[in-house]
Amino acid sequence: MESTHKKKILIFIDWYRPAYLAGGPIQSVFNMVNALEKDYFFYICTSNSDIGSGNELVGITPNKWLKSSSNSEVIYLSAENRTKKTFLSILKIQEFESIYFNSLFSFKFSLLPLFLAKNLNTGSKLILAPRGMLGSGSLKLKKTKK
């Protein structure tokens, strides 16, 4: 992992580049990382597959921090490493200014790490981005599951 003097933000997101099938959320987080490159360094924790696919992303080494851009590193977690133990170790690697959760209804990449971060009392600002998931139209879909 890179050491930097910029403020550090940890992002949890189900899918990230080169995954693309989830569309907008991937692109908006990518755009945020690029727009804030002068002031922040991002650590992105994501899965090593694309939405609806059990296949690993091609050319990606899972479970290892990889340089993504001048201001970001990404860890692509395999299914067997999306565990409480792994998330705790990621949350403890260093102090983060903020921890950003890019979903509301994702157990592995929002609820579990949010619960762990809250209980660790890291001092980091916790940002939960529901991304329209609380809209009346969205709540009508798969109501029981949500």
Residue ranges of model-derived segments:
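A conserved, positively charged/aromatic
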Residues: L134-K146
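Active-site proximal beta-strand in glycosyltransferases
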Residues: K8-I9, S98, A117-G137
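N-terminal subdomain of nucleotide-sugar transferases
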Residues: M1-V58, K64-L66, Q94, T122
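Glycine-rich nucleotide phosphate-binding loop and flanking beta-alpha elements
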Residues: I51, S106-F107, L134
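Short N-terminal targeting/anchoring amphipathic segment
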Residues: L88-F109, P113, G123-A129
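Glycine-rich, highly charged phosphate/nucleotide-binding loops
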Residues: V58-G59, V74-L88
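Glycine-rich His-Gly loop
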Residues: D14-W15, S103, G132
